Structure formats: structure tokens, C-alpha cells
From Swiss-Prot:
List of residues binding Mg(2+): T26
Protein name per Swiss-Prot or TrEMBL: Elongation factor Tu
Encoding gene per record: tuf
Keywords for this protein: Cytoplasm, Elongation factor, GTP-binding, Hydrolase, Magnesium, Metal-binding, Nucleotide-binding, Protein biosynthesis
Reaction catalysed by this enzyme: GTP + H2O = GDP + phosphate + H(+)
């Protein structure tokens, strides 16, 4: 029989494995590819050694090691990210280098939740990972069923304490190693299939960029004699049609205007959509009323803010970051989308200073408002060089 051609006609979803060191994240990743490859559907088995030697990538100047595997179930196509070290997870989640629409939290039944289990759940909450599914691994190392129940209760309480729905989250018990070694199918292969069924069902299908509200960060502003003002940029989400009303948000008071023309590659279009680099002609807007760093957006869809809480990774000296710590009242530039805005940092009460290589949650007060929602990524810069990366976790004002 000829090999079936791989067609991506299924919805796509990005997931990853998170959890404490040595609880079995990479083994589970390999086991998923093995079990699904054997189940058919054009999947390829990727062994542990190949996932473990993750290539180093540079994202916004930060060195991150990540492994990417892909597989599909009957209902979805997945891109799955696995990181070798704890620091890689922290950097990955904060920079959004590998976007996660959901995650599989791996907890060893023998150890229960450990410090990095907590930290990864907290990070998932802070950076806005929408849903988690739990794989309780190494159940063959625990003889007492009551102990397994206790560990499950502990995991559910921990999830609830970080505002995840601990009572509802699916927890699948099994052994990733048993699945890899073709032993004990009940906790091996069957458990992996149950896990993927839970992931299919419980992790919501992400909204495609095209289906979201229109947003375009403004990169440049031109005035074209006899036509008016044109702003250019890459449409991040949604669609804008000629004749639609939009808002210009950020840096100054929000203004409404109408898009009277959309141009791409010097051709006139009826609309611009997510991914397009366009020029938008704005009715009755003076060249001086709009600037780089603002966004064009569907009216009412996004608001400007100056104060927020953020989860931040501070680059190490080796990554080209600072060589010295910084303290409260540190005033760097915050680079959002297309521009820098100065902001002042407020550290948590128990933190005196922040060292290069740290990750930390702190408050920021900008000198000018930026269009933002929780989940927006930014870089921290000093004199044009990146010294940190962050994500807005909540908006204060």
C-alpha cells in the first residue's frame, strides 16, 4: 500500500511538556511520538536521545534550548515543545519563543509536586497558558494506591492555588518508560492514548489570528500629497476592510479614524489581514497626529495603559545582558511592538536587587501609555541593547 500523503487538514495546536527536573517530561514526549506512530496516521517516532539533545536557539538575543516534535491525533495536529533544562523553560515561557496553547504538566508519582512543578504552574498562569492536563508519571514506583490518591489530591490543590480549575483538570496516571519499552500496556501505551484523548478534549482549540479583532502596530507614517496620511505595518491579528472605522491607540489620547484605502506591494486591496504588510490610508488624520509605536485597532478592542505587572527574564552576562544587578527605581526602556517607552520598576517587598540571569515578577510604570492586554511581550533595553524579556501578566491602570 502506498504511504498516505500527509495533509494538514486538521486544526493545529501548540503544546509543551512542563514540570520538575527528572519527572519524565522528555521520556513522555518520546513515548507520545512512539505510541501515536504505532497507531498510524503518518506519525514518526522520535527517540529520547534526539529530543534530549535540543538545539540552542536565539530568541531576542536570549539563548534557549528547545526540542520541537510534531504528531497528530484523529482530531488535531500538534507541535510539541520540550526543553532540557529548567532555565530553558523559564526563558521559553516568558519570551513566548514557542507559543503554548496548552501544556502537559508531568509529575512523578513517587515524588509528588516539587519546587519546579510550582514554578512552572505559576509561570503558566503568569504568561497566560490557557489550559493544563496532568500526566502522573512513574506510577509503577508506587505500590500503595492510597499514596497515588494523595499525590493526585496534592496536585489538584496546587493547581487550584494558582487559579487553575484543579478539580476539573484531567489527571492521567501511567508510566512513560513502560510505553517506550513496550511493557505493561495498561500503564504504558493505554495511558498515553488516554492522555492524548484528554489533551484533544480538554485543551481548547486556539483562536486563529485571522479570527481575532483587527490590530496593526504602526511602523511608519507617510503623508501623500492629495491623498492624506498613510501608516504602514504588519497586521498582527484580524482583518481590516476599506471603509471601516478604526482607533489609533497608545502614546496619546485614543482617536477614531476611517481606513479609506489599503495597499500592499503597491497594489490597492479591499482588505488587509493577519500576516499582511500593508499601508493604510487614514481619513482626516494629520501626519503629526499619528506615530510609530501606536496601533491601529478595531474600536473598543484594546486600551492604552501605563501601569502593569510583568513576569521578566533578565539576560545573563553571557547572553550580552547586564554585568551588574539592578535595584528598585531602575528606569530602562520597555520595547513594545515597534517602540521604546521609559518605565520605572517596582520590586516585590522581599527583593532587594535583581541579578543577571534571574527571573522575577515586578511592577512597571511607563511614562506614556501603550496599547496592551495581558500576554503582551516586550523587551527591556538600555541604550539600544536588550537586557531582559518580559510578558504583561496583569494590568493595574
Amino acid at each position: 500500500m502506498a504511504k498516505a500523503k500527509f495533509e494538514r487538514n486538521k486544526p493545529h495546536c501548540n503544546i509543551g511538556t512542563i514540570g520538575h527536573v527528572d519527572h519524565g517530561k522528555t521520556t513522555l514526549t518520546a513515548a507520545i511520538t512512539k505510541v501515536l506512530a504505532e497507531a498510524g496516521g503518518g506519525n514518526t517516532f522520535v527517540d529520547y536521545a534526539n529530543i534530549d539533545k535540543a538545539p540552542e536557539e536565539r530568541e531576542r538575543g536570549i539563548t534557549i534550548s528547545t526540542s520541537h516534535v510534531e504528531y497528530e491525533t484523529e482530531t488535531r495536529h500538534y507541535a510539541h515543545v520540550d526543553c532540557p533544562g529548567h532555565a530553558d523553560y523559564v526563558k521559553n515561557m516568558i519570551t513566548g519563543a514557542a507559543q503554548m496553547d496548552g501544556a502537559i504538566l508531568v509529575v512523578s508519582a513517587a515524588d509528588g509536586p516539587m519546587p519546579q512543578t510550582r514554578e512552572h504552574i505559576l509561570l503558566a498562569r503568569q504568561v497566560g497558558v490557557p489550559a493544563l492536563v496532568v500526566f502522573m508519571n512513574k506510577v509503577d514506583q508506587v505500590d500503595d494506591p492510597e499514596l497515588l490518591e494523595l499525590v493526585e489530591m496534592e496536585i489538584r490543590e496546587l493547581l487550584s492555588s494558582y487559579d487553575f480549575p484543579g478539580d476539573d483538570i484531567p489527571i492521567v496516571k501511567g508510566s512513560a518508560l513502560a510505553a517506550l519499552e513496550d511493557k505493561n500496556p495498561e500503564i504504558g501505551k493505554e495511558a498515553i492514548l488516554s492522555l492524548m484523548a484528554a489533551v484533544d478534549e480538554y485543551i481548547p482549540q486556539p483562536e486563529r489570528p485571522l479570527d481575532k479583532s483587527f490590530l496593526m502596530p504602526i511602523e511608519d507614517v507617510f503623508s501623500i500629497s492629495g491623498r492624506g496620511t498613510v501608516v504602514t505595518g504588519r497586521v498582527e491579528t484580524g482583518i481590516v476592510k476599506v471603509g471601516e472605522e478604526v482607533e489609533i491607540v497608545g502614546l496619546r489620547d485614543t482617536k477614531k479614524t476611517t481606513v479609506t484605502g489599503v495597499e500592499m506591494f503597491r497594489k490597492l486591496l479591499d482588505q488587509g489581514q493577519a500576516g499582511d504588510n500593508i499601508g493604510a490610508l487614514l481619513r482626516g488624520t494629520a501626519r503629526t497626529e499619528v506615530e510609530r509605536g501606536q496601533v491601529l485597532a478595531k474600536p473598543g478592542s484594546i486600551t492604552p495603559h501605563t501601569e502593569f505587572k510583568a513576569e521578566v527574564y533578565v539576560l545573563s552576562k553571557d547572553e550580552g545582558g547586564r554585568h551588574t544587578p539592578f535595584f528598585a527605581n531602575y528606569r530602562p526602556q520597555f520595547y513594545f511592538r515597534t517602540t521604546d517607552v521609559t518605565g520605572e520598576i517596582t520590586l516585590p517587598e522581599d527583593v532587594e536587587m535583581v541579578m543577571p540571569g534571574d527571573n522575577i515578577a515586578f511592577g512597571v510604570k511607563l511614562i506614556a501609555p501603550i496599547a496592551m492586554d495581558p500576554g503582551l511581550r516586550f523587551a527591556i533595553r538600555e541604550g539600544g541593547r536588550t537586557v531582559g524579556a518580559g510578558v504583561v501578566s496583569s494590568i493595574i491602570k
